C-alpha cells in the first residue's frame, strides 16, 4: 500500500526530532578542518584513499578510489538500482566522468545505492542515462512541451526511493516529483545546449 504525502511528512518530522533536541542542548555546526577542491590522498595505516571532486550527480560529487584494493566508491555517480533524481545534476560532465572511470584500474564499484558490482557495469549505467536523455531529446524534436514529455517519457522506476521489506521508502507522489525533476533537468539542459 503506497504511503500518503501526509504520512511521509509525519515520518520526516519524527526523524528530525532527535536533531532538534541536539540543537536545543547546545549542538553547533563544526566546519571541516581538512578540505580539498580537486584531488586528495589520505592514508589509514597502509591503505591509500584517493578522493576526486567531480561534477556529476551533483556539482560537488566525490569519488573515493582505493588503488591497492582496486575498489571505487562512486556515491550516486553510479547506482545499480535505478537512476537517481537528476535535478541539479551536471549531465554532460557526468557522462565524461563515466568515460574517465573506464580508464581507471579497478575491479569493483561500491555504488551510492544498490549492491557492489564489477567495473563492467559502467557501460550499462551510462547507457541507461543516455537512453533517458535521448528519449527527452526525441520528444523535444517532435515539438512536445515539458508537460507532454512528463506524460510521454517513462523509464525504470526509481528503485532507490521505493518501499521494500527493509526500507519504508518515499510515497508515490515524492517519487513522481523526482521523475519530473529528472525530466525537467534534462529538458532544460538540452534547451540551453548543455547536453
Task: Please describe what each predicted stretch is.
Residues 1-138:
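Metallo-beta-lactamase
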Residues 26, 83-85, 149:
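Alpha-helical interaction segments
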Residues 19-37, 60-74, 160-168:
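Short, charge-rich amphipathic segments
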Residues 1-21, 103-105, 116-195:
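Accessory terminal helices/loops
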